[in-house]
């Protein structure tokens, strides 16, 4: 992980590395082992589903719920109140330019949720083992690889929208 610590006046660039040390090589006393946080395995149901699971909303949680279901072999149906991202961008831009507000398609409703119009900063919970899975998934769908090592991961809205469409 990369981070910058400027809390105590001076700026300190910090890097945490995972390394393997050969036998016989003494580790320095200030080296600390890194605990790898593995995402828990998802338990699969045992009963066959008669219908596809339904996910309500295509915001971050809805997209990831649908993606996880699809990876497990289900065919989820995602219901979203707003429009697909390309149409949503046009509708929101029209509103920003002084046009009419669309109660069905706006900054809050549509593919990507409210985050599709944010600055692209990711609030990741460092202690949550699923956090790494989320970042890896975003990187697999076109987010910059740097988010995997940044302490404060940042995609940027211009890059976030194609990632959402890819998912």
Regions from the PLM with identified roles:
Residues 1-117, 121-141, 145-167:
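Residues forming the flavin
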């Amino acid at each position: 992980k990369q981070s910058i610590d400027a809390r105590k006046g001076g700026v300190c660039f910090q890097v945490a590395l995972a390394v393997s040390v050969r036998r016989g090589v003494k580790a320095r006393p200030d080296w600390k082992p890194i605990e790898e946080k593995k995402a828990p395995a998802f338990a699969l149901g045992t009963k066959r589903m008669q219908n596809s699971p339904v996910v309500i909303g295509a915001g971050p949680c809805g997209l990831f719920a649908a993606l996880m279901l699809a990876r497990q072999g289900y065919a989820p149906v995602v219901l979203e109140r707003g429009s697909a991202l390309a149409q949503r961008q046009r509708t929101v831009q029209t509103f920003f330019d002084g046009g009419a507000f669309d109660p069905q398609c706006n900054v809050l409703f549509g593919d990507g949720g409210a985050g599709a119009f944010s600055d692209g900063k990711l609030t990741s919970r460092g202690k949550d083992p699923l956090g790494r899975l989320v970042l890896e998934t975003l990187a697999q769908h076109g987010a910059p690889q740097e988010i995997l090592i940044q302490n404060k991961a940042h995609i940027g809205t211009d890059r976030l929208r194609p990632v959402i469409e890819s998912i």
